[in-house]
Amino acid sequence: MSHKTKSTTQERKAGKSSAPQRQVVSKSSLQKKVSKPTATAKLQKSKALHPRNAHNNGYDFAALVTAFPKLKAFVKPNPYGNLSIDFADPVAVKMLNAALLKFHYGVGHWDIPDGFLCPPIPGRADYIHHVADLLAVKKSSKKRIPKGPKVRVLDIGTGANVIYPLLGIQSYGWDFVGSDVDPLSIANAQQIFAGNSDIANKFSSRLQADSKHVFHGVIEANERFDLTLCNPPFHASLAEASEGTARKLKNLAANRAKSSQVMSPQVQPSGKVKPATDKNHGVLNFGGQKAELWCEGGELQFLRTMIEESHDFASQCLWFTTLVSKKENLNPAKALLAKIKAEEVKEIEMHQGNKITRVLAWTFLKPEQRELWVQYRDAQ
């Protein structure tokens, strides 16, 4: 996986801002004229996952089986004699995820209902590590990633798999709030944390009662988050989602047919659990519920809603972030961020096999306001 980061800073004219006690910034201090952005800064590309990603060396199946014996039945040599699983088998993929969570992150209980998304963990972990870098503060000559419960993160659309809270909690000790429009997803997320008593108090869930909103109805008055995360639904309809699944199945079949090109664990297609009643291997094998796969207007409309609503919570969140699957949606999203006067916008590009995923991050706080935020948080 390679990544590059683009950063745009928009400086506004100085003006008076009045913030109430115990508030780092006020909304009025965020609504000032924006000048032209500075030049784009690029980070050096890397062919690997994030340096802190536990999956940089692929999958150690022998160790995974030892940690999670249920995986053993699905592990077998591939055409080159290396241990692997059939990534077209949704049960095998789910067992692999459970093993990875147990071995690398100490998550003893993890399960999802049939038909819900089963996320590829290495890529999800990369998102967590990259957004952690946004929070890094310089201490002497080194940068420090803040850890522990003082850092609060909001996961929009946490899903039944609740993967981002699990990875963020076990990697950095952060506290999470997970929201979702699906009651079944919320119930399963709660069940997962109930089954992991050592971290059960680090996660709370909130049902989004209105699917037309993202932050409204979730973020409470005077509540503060250091980060928001989101993996938006990227299809505009069920038909479009089905077409996308069909393409994945076709590509997977083509790759399996090429015995001379065995994929490494890091570039395997993302396995997603199919419904248990589906006996036809040609039907949706990558799974996913409606809210996980599509929404009216697709990814772009979801991004627009998220960005517009983020302005209403400008002083309550340090960094807003989201994955962007479709490259063509980046420019419209950035244009909207410029329109609502985001102070700084970053684009982080991540590669996993042939798939390119981008993280879009933005903040309404000026650098000095961010410093005050950190001081206030760490003093609590």
Swiss-Prot record:
GO terms for biological process: rRNA base methylation. Residues 44-53 have a biased composition (Basic residues). It catalyses: adenosine(1618) in 23S rRNA + S-adenosyl-L-methionine = N(6)-methyladenosine(1618) in 23S rRNA + S-adenosyl-L-homocysteine + H(+). Residues 1-54, 260-279 are annotated as: Disordered. GO terms for molecular function: 23S rRNA (adenine(1618)-N(6))-methyltransferase activity. Its EC number is 2.1.1.181. It is found in: Cytoplasm. Keywords: Cytoplasm, Methyltransferase, rRNA processing, S-adenosyl-L-methionine, Transferase. Residues 21-32, 260-270 have a biased composition (Low complexity). GO terms for cellular component: cytoplasm. It comes from the Bacteria. The keyword S-adenosyl-L-methionine applies. The keyword Zinc-finger does not apply. Belongs to the methyltransferase superfamily. METTL16/RlmF family. Specifically methylates the adenine in position 1618 of 23S rRNA. This is Ribosomal RNA large subunit methyltransferase F. It comes from Shewanella pealeana (strain ATCC 700345 / ANG-SQ1). The lineage of its organism: Bacteria, Pseudomonadati, Pseudomonadota, Gammaproteobacteria, Alteromonadales.
